[in-house]
Curated annotation (Swiss-Prot):
UniProt main location, coarse: nucleus
Similarity comment: family membership: Belongs to the gonadal family.
Name of the protein: Protein DGCR6L
Source species of the chain: Homo sapiens
Described purpose of this protein according to its UniProt entry: May play a role in neural crest cell migration into the third and fourth pharyngeal pouches.
Amino acid sequence: MERYAAALEEVADGARQQERHYQLLSALQSLVKELPSSFQQRLSYTTLSDLALALLDGTVFEIVQGLLEIQHLTEKSLYNQRLRLQNEHRVLRQALRQKHQEAQQACRPHNLPVVQAAQQRELEAVEHRIREEQRAMDQKIILELDRKVADQQSTLEKAGVAGFYVTTNPQELMLQMNLLELIRKLQQRGCRAGNAALGLGGPWQSPAAQCDQKGSPVPP
């Protein structure tokens, strides 16, 4: 009798999994219609079906939520670093202007052209330094964001999410961004309407609960 009950439960569980897969696939097919036609053509039925399978137990929603939170923290940190550098440059320029004004006021009139020429050379040197520091900061930001993208690609590939692998190809990156957007919108739909609206079971509640507490994830 126990064997029979276990077999029935296994069949019922399989049916529930099939239903969840169907609901996710239908939702994905509906969301894909909102994408540009060029990307719709690349998201075949097989790709969407594989994506729906990867989303079944809710783990991928958790992974995406975590990746986006890490990305946002990284972006905020890099933004603050650049802001600090800009403030340092602003203070440096103000101090240099003050120094030059005081020097001009203190010098004899016949020495003014010589002082001004020296000050112009100093100003050009400082502006060159500022440009170099800004360029280095921008390169650092680009490299750090590229590393984060590669980390996201690798993590989602290991999680079995269709369409994700490490690449720098612009078209593939755009496709992956669209796939992330589909996942995010599914998660938002779960936040707004609850699992019942999609016919999804318990495992998907955790990301929805996170949305209730922290707000919906923001696309990369």
